[in-house]
Amino acid sequence: MDPNTVSSFQVDCFLWHVRKQVADQELGDAPFLDRLRRDQKSLRGRGSTLGLNIETATRVGKQIVERILKEESDEALKMTMASAPASRYLTDMTIEEMSRDWFMLMPKQKVAGPLCIRMDQAIMDKNIILKANFSVIFDRLETLILLRAFTEEGAIVGEISPLPSLPGHTNEDVKNAIGVLIGGLEWSDNTVRVSKTLQRFAWRSSSENGRPPLTPKQKRKMARTIRSEVRRNKMAD
């Protein structure tokens, strides 16, 4: 096992422990608490994958952090903080919308890289909007916390979430997952659009209605479908 993978996990465990203490003292805001819950699931998944005990890893992580802080001067810390890019946390969903349980009549689940896509195939002929909570850096999506699909009535009918056992994903991973979710929902004659915030940061070349542009493969498939419909209509005439 790569020692850097182990030490990274150990430090992450200790830093999560510190953030948990902050939350216990009621010093964290909603985005802080949201990330804390998500990171807890991620650490459990990583610990299981690596075969490492979280409590033991936390103690070792504390030693690593203490050693670094002891060796680092205040001036070096100031320079690091000044040069580090700042990320922003953007929220389409409320805490209630993010934490609400939902159920599927005809569940479908697909794993796309480090992301899990879930949708209810029983939903038909609905107007659906995709909302997400995520962080942004350099005007691009940095980390997806959670994406959900809502009907006009507020029912949850789809979701994209990071896999706890596979931390880390790219902007391209998110775009691909959104395309899969949209395609699955539209298969049942639903009309899907994307929130303005997600449209702005997840991709730059969306159409005006919040839809990503069709890929060449999708365009060819649509052309074949149209030709097939035309032939059937001619035969019917």
UniProtKB/Swiss-Prot annotation:
GO terms for molecular function: protein serine/threonine kinase inhibitor activity; RNA binding. It is found in: Host nucleus; Host cytoplasm. Its main location: host cell. A motif (Nuclear localization signal) lies at residues 34-38. One of its GO terms (biological process) is symbiont-mediated suppression of host gene expression. The keyword Ubl conjugation applies. Residues 204-237 are annotated as: Disordered. Residues 226-237 have a biased composition (Basic and acidic residues). One of its GO terms (cellular component) is host cell cytoplasm. Upon interferon induction, ISGylated via host HERC5; this results in the impairment of NS1 interaction with RNA targets due to its inability to form homodimers and to interact with host EIF2AK2/PKR. Gene3D superfamilies: Influenza virus non-structural protein, effector domain (3.30.420.330), S15/NS1, RNA-binding (1.10.287.10). Homodimer. Interacts with host TRIM25 (via coiled coil); this interaction specifically inhibits TRIM25 multimerization and TRIM25-mediated RIGI CARD ubiquitination. Interacts with human EIF2AK2/PKR, CPSF4, IVNS1ABP and PABPN1. Inhibits post-transcriptional processing of cellular pre-mRNA, by binding and inhibiting two cellular proteins that are required for the 3'-end processing of cellular pre-mRNAs: the 30 kDa cleavage and polyadenylation specificity factor/CPSF4 and the poly(A)-binding protein 2/PABPN1. In turn, unprocessed 3' end pre-mRNAs accumulate in the host nucleus and are no longer exported to the cytoplasm. Cellular protein synthesis is thereby shut off very early after virus infection. The dsRNA-binding region is required for suppression of RNA silencing. Belongs to the influenza A viruses NS1 family. This is Non-structural protein 1.
